[in-house]
């Protein structure tokens, strides 16, 4: 048994812990209530929260207050327009390590908002600096450009894009440092001038977007690469559009798209502002002018010829000529970036194409300007057409943008017109007769169905009348009526049901039909007969049928068993005890040996009997002759033993000589064949000498 644990009893409310007596008898321990445990947990959590607040507010061990590490975010146009300043969160959910000191070269140390930096940002935003005004004006002018690039997925010079995101959105602190503002304004100016997107690696996960700002040296190197690749990109854009879109419809479709995307006043203002800002950047202009001159040499041929054809005969313009002309204007070495263009670039393609087209129109003083202006005016007039045509133009442009030239499919061999159907041949006389017969049968059936419908209508009306008349019987006295008697015969005919009359008519007609057998039709069909004039072959005709009278079962009688009856001396137990002489003992042993030999002989004979019945009879005679001397010897010995000592012997009825002289007769009995197990048992008993002697059944009889 486990010993009981002594425990303190529960005290009452008024008692103290010291007054409670120690019990002599052990009791169960007191269980604490769940409410007390919950109260302890609440008190502990409140203490921990207070300690956390103290650590955050006063710092840990005299160090600076804990500030979450944040990275700067790309400044968007909407934030510049609204001039929003986002403060850092007051208290993070989990305390973090104190921020390491960083050098002045990195932009992260400048842009991260700490305790002092947040105040500086507020002061800078309150007092609008001239640099900030320029920045906001530039962003307002390029609102549409920033809207198209809100995804902030920026290209790396190698042509790849890296996008990562963090969990929480970070506030963008702008206006606090003039160096950062200058860099941002330079990048925006480059965007307006038609350069690539700002060279910043955006790191974006599913929830948050941050940027890794680079040093000035890296930025200068990347800017040079982008400027060198700028003209090649414009060439690739122009050539790709010239490959897919016909030159006659190029300007019209671009004008329609710009009209749909942006209103005409806004588009003009944006283009004028962008051109004004490009004039300020002299370095970019020098590079562009050199590249544009090379473009002008290749483009005029592709613009002049199809434009004239389109104005004069737009419907008869063949597709093959335009494709050949476009191939001439293509550059031999397109840039790699035109091949691996992202979907964002494909969306911005119409804007860049419009800008490049405007620049070419101003600087190229060739007669192509007149044709392009006329087509642009026509496109503005056609912009008011229904939306179905615009959608068709878009679908055509999308198909051509994929690089598939739209050509009308003209089959080599057109199908011939089918002639009139062949006139059917006249049917034979038998078919015509069969068709007439079917037609007559159908007409007869149709007439019968109409007659039955008329008869049924009359029957319904007559049934209603007869029921009404039967209900009125006895109410009105008529001539010839007797109270309690049947109605007169004239009335009875009228009051009869039509069904009864119809049944009477059918019964009379059936009687007449049965009386005269001539009215019945012979419905029997002729017997199906085979072809005549052919005979069976002689082999089949001369065959004789074999009649088997016997069933095929035969009865055979044979002897399966044989019984041989022999007399034998049986000794009782008392007699054996009395006669213990050696002579008698030897004689009994000799007799047993002789009996065993005889049994073996009999077994051999039984095995040979199964072969042939004749051999069995011969062997039986031999055995009888051989057994006679043996039996005589036995009789002599028995007489000697009887003369020597009196022995009680159970002898069957009749003398021994009669029994011995009688030959075994052949008897057939209906005995079941013993099983193999029984045979083995009998053999074992015979060998051991335990089998009953052959004289015992005679004693029983």
Curated annotation (Swiss-Prot):
Chief location category: cytoplasm
Compartments (UniProt record): Cytoplasm, Cytoskeleton, Actin patch
Residue stretches of biased makeup (Polar residues): 237-247, 347-359, 504-519, 652-670
Lineage top rank: taxon: Eukaryota
GO CC annotation, single: actin cortical patch
Composition-biased stretches (Basic and acidic residues): 203-236, 266-294, 306-319, 375-397, 404-414, 445-455, 494-503, 619-642, 676-688
Biased composition (Acidic residues): 589-599
Compositional bias per record (Basic residues), positions renumbered to this chain: 524-537
Region feature Disordered, mapped onto this chain: 1-35, 53-177, 203-546, 589-701
Residue ranges, compositional bias (Low complexity): 337-346
Keyword line: Cytoplasm, Cytoskeleton
Sequence similarity: Belongs to the AIM21 family.
Function: Involved in mitochondrial migration along actin filaments.
Name of this protein: Altered inheritance of mitochondria protein 21
Species of origin: Candida glabrata (strain ATCC 2001 / BCRC 20586 / JCM 3761 / NBRC 0622 / NRRL Y-65 / CBS 138)
Primary gene name: AIM21
């Amino acid at each position: 048994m486990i010993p009981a644990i002594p425990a303190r009893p529960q005290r009452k409310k008024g008692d103290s812990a010291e007054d409670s007596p120690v019990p002599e008898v052990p009791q169960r321990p007191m269980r604490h209530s769940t409410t007390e445990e919950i109260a302890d947990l609440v008190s502990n959590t409140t203490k921990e929260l207070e300690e956390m607040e103290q650590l955050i507010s006063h710092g840990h061990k005299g160090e600076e207050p804990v500030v979450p590490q944040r990275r700067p975010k790309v400044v968007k146009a909407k934030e510049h327009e609204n001039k929003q300043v986002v403060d850092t969160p007051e208290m993070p959910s989990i305390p973090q390590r104190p921020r390491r000191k960083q050098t002045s070269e990195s932009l992260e140390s400048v842009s991260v908002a700490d305790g002092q930096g947040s105040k500086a940002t507020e002061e800078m935003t309150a007092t609008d600096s001239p640099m900030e005004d320029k920045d906001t004006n530039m962003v307002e002018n390029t609102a549409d450009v920033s809207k198209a690039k809100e995804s902030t997925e920026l290209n790396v010079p190698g042509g790849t894009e890296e996008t990562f995101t963090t969990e929480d959105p970070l506030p963008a602190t702008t206006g606090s440092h003039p160096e950062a503002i200058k860099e941002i304004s330079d990048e925006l100016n480059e965007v307006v001038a038609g350069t690539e997107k700002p060279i910043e690696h955006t790191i974006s996960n599913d929830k948050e977007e941050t940027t890794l700002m680079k040093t000035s040296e890296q930025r200068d190197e990347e800017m040079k690469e982008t400027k060198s690749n700028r003209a090649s990109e414009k060439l690739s854009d122009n050539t790709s559009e010239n490959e897919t879109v016909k030159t006659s419809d190029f300007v019209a479709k671009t004008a329609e798209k710009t009209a749909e995307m942006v209103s005409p006043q806004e588009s003009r203002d944006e283009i004028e502002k962008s051109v004004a800002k490009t004039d300020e950047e002299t370095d970019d202009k020098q590079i562009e002018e050199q590249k544009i001159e090379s473009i002008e040499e290749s483009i005029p041929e592709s613009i002049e010829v199809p434009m004239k054809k389109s104005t004069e005969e737009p419907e008869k313009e063949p597709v093959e000529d335009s494709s050949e002309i476009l191939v001439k204007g293509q550059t031999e070495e397109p840039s790699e970036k035109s091949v691996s263009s992202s979907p964002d670039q494909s969306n911005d393609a119409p804007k860049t194409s419009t800008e490049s087209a405007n620049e070419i129109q101003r600087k190229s003083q060739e007669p192509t300007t007149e044709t392009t202006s006329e087509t642009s005016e026509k496109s503005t007039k056609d912009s008011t057409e229904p939306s179905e045509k615009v959608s068709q133009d878009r679908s055509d442009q999308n198909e051509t943008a994929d690089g598939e030239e739209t050509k009308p499919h003209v089959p080599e061999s057109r199908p011939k017109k089918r002639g009139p159907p062949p006139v059917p041949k006249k049917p034979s006389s038998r078919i015509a007769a069969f068709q007439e017969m079917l037609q007559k049968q159908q007409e007869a059936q149709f007439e019968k169905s109409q007659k039955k419908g008329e008869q049924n209508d009359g029957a319904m009306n007559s049934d209603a009348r007869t029921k009404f008349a039967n209900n009125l019987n006895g109410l009105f006295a008529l001539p010839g009526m007797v109270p309690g008697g049947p109605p007169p015969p004239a009335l009875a005919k009228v009051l009869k049901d039509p069904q009864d009359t119809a049944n009477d008519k059918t019964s009379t007609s059936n009687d007449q039909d049965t009386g005269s057998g001539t009215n019945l039709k012979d419905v029997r069909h002729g017997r199906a007969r085979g072809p005549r004039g052919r005979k069976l072959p002689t082999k089949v005709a001369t065959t004789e049928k074999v009649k088997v009278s016997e069933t095929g079962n035969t009865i055979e009688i044979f002897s399966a068993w044989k019984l041989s009856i022999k007399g034998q001396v049986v000794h009782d137990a008392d007699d054996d005890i009395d006669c213990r002489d050696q002579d008698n003992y030897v004689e009994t042993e000799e007799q047993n040996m002789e009996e065993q030999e005889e049994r073996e002989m009999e077994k051999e004979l039984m095995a040979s009997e199964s072969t042939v019945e004749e051999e069995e009879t011969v062997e039986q005679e031999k055995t009888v002759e051989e057994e006679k001397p043996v039996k005589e010897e036995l009789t002599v010995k028995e007489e000697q033993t009887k003369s020597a000592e009196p022995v009680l012997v159970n002898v069957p009825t009749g003398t021994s000589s009669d029994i011995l002289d009688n030959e075994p007769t052949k008897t057939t009995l209906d005995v079941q064949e013993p099983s193999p197990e029984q045979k083995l048992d009998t053999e074992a008993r015979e060998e051991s000498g335990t089998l009953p002697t052959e004289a015992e059944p005679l004693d029983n009889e």
